[in-house]
Amino acid sequence: MPTQNFQSARKCRRVRHHISRRFNQRLICIAIATLGESASWAGGEQVLEKVEITGTATNLVGVADSANVGTVTKKQLEARTVYRPGELLESAPGLVVSQHSGEGKANQFYLRGFNLDHGTDLRTTVDGMLVNQRSHSHGQGWTDLNFLIPELATGLEYKKGPYYANEGDFASAGAVSIRYADRLDSGIANLGFGQNGFRRALIADSPKLGNGNLLYAVEAMHNDGPFVHGDDYRKSNGVLRYSEGDQANGFNVSAMGYTAKWNATDQIAKRAVDAGTLGRFDAIDPSDGGESHRYSLSGAWHRSTETSSTNVNAYVTDWKLRLFSNFTYFLDDPINGDQFHQPDDRTTTGVNASHTWQMQGLGLASENTVGAQFQNDNIFNGLYSTRDRQILSKTRSDHIAETGLGVYAENATRWLPWFRTVAGVRGDTYRFHVGSNLDANSGKVTQSIANPKLDLIFGPWAKTEFYLNAGGGFHSNDARGTTLTVDPKTGDPADKVPALVRSKGLEVGVRTSFVPGLQTSLSIYRLDFASELVFAGDAGTTEAGRPSRRTGFEFANYYKLSDWLTVDADLAFARARFRDNDPDGIGLRIPGSVEGVGSIALAVDNLGRWFGALQFRYFGPRPLIEDNSVRSASTATFNGRVGYKISPRTRVDLEGFNLTNRKASAIDYYYTSRLPGEPAAGVNDIHFHPIESRSFRVTLSTNF
């Protein structure tokens, strides 16, 4: 390899300080380490422009595989005003994070025409640990991000569509990765107070210890929300990490712990609010709520040479959830009510490993990656009928052992100065072992799936690239559905479902930084699912969904107008339909599928001691039933913050949420429920959870 490329390899490591080594590492190294820094032929070799890193954004022209991948920097995350930790994910264009219950419950997610429920089809990892929970008692892919400490995040990386060989289960709509810091620039101490019982304290630092750093963070928080029966959400959170080395060579070992308890105001019937018998923030069953904990031990090791890199991480997590909900009130049990309990106790172990090496020959530069991902879940969960959190009867209880192994290979090659490809293949095998309280619903199932991936990248010309992406993906179904033969509630025969459901995606896109200071990407996509089979945790049975298709576009812009003003503006639209010609005549719309999402965010800094931000988010109307005769309203909110730097190390922030105090819904459903005195068959109605009323929080922060 020429000396020039060895020097560029060192630059590659410096870039990785800003871009996670797990994100598009193959093309970063092709672009910088293997090919150099000019967009021309040199000595018979093809070379690319270097990756441009700024303090606020990463320019991925010449590096990214598609128009829908991106990196959100730490500075961008810090500028966001978030009501809850999970809302950090809204920095990915087109992604909406909501809540339909108490604060301790996993968020509701929307992306690319999907109502992702609590995380299905949006793969989320923190420090390489999969957050989505398989075969969860409440919902497949349950993604509880309440353990996240925003101040520790070094950045967020997102990808959309099933085009990436290193992304497996749950990644059909997209994948989000968050990485914690190994070392802080300085210690952090925050103290916050606000309306509705909000209180938060955080202290974190990373002093030197031996040859490395020992990072610690401790967080405590309380919040009631605007509800008549307050959430009384109490959270304790901690992180301890020892690390040595840098982004090129090093390791870390981490321990995390999170506990929480809360009350929940679940969605309420619109008819009761319209009649004046119930307020928007009232609860129908005030005993709803839950408690949860998450403990984890993890480690990561990485090593790089001039022409290769190896990454390994391993983790073990212990999750526990006690969740009490009541969505239909008195429909099934007019005496005791319909509250149900969904316990979930699990231990998850996982290992991820990948190796990348560069090659040159025949005037071509390429990079190869092979990897393996293993995860095992040992799960005890169930479904019980309750009243005031006291068990009345058992619907089902199960012990589940679920093991998944994925292997993948990928090649990235530049064929011409203006054309490169990324081709990959991924294979996954899952084994389910279900031991149910009903022997008829016990059993073992093994299923495998393979998916090809292909990216064609053209350019760059005038700092502009064009993309064509195609690939297959999948999500796993709840293990209990794969062995189900009897409805545990009624005793009727029930059909089993496939363990793995295939998806197919196709996308065209463009990315440009031609206008100085402006980064723009546009993508048009199609995503098909063979079936949206899901396990209905609220009923203990499977629901066989129909084949579906989603088409849409996403338009994302980041514009640094000056040293003191930046603008993020995103627009997304999706058309979601069942594609089975409607044999039952009920309609082709997919209930809950988001159609339009828009956002614009202004961030102001470097104005003396003042700084601030303003965010607008639009969440469009959605069909609530298949024939589109019942639809939700749209939701539009303004959040903002203004801050003052008391000294170089101390500042005060005032954050405001729902500044216009709109009375809108965080989520809407349409189904049958029964309030006291109503007909035994119940009433079909919209059920909604309101967005929080206008509120403010003040936080004093200091660095030490």
Regions found by a protein language model. Name each.
Residues 77, 567, 621-622, 644-704:
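C-terminal beta-signal and adjacent terminal beta-strands/loops
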Residues 86, 90-133:
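Extracytoplasmic beta-strand/coil segments of soluble accessory domains associated
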Residues 130-160, 178-179, 497:
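Short acidic/polar hinge/loop motifs at secondary-structure boundaries
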Residues 157-165, 174-207, 218, 223-228, ...:
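Short strand-turn segments of transmembrane beta-barrel domains in outer membranes
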Residues 193-222, 227-265, 288-309, 415:
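Transmembrane beta-barrel wall of Gram-negative outer-membrane proteins
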Residues 250-258, 290-437, 457-461, 514, ...:
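Face-selective signature of the C-terminal outer-membrane beta-barrel domain
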Residues 300, 309-327, 459-475, 497-563, ...:
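Membrane-embedded beta-barrel scaffold of Gram-negative outer-membrane proteins
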Residues 354-358, 521-529, 544-626, 699-703:
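Gram-negative outer-membrane beta-barrel transporters
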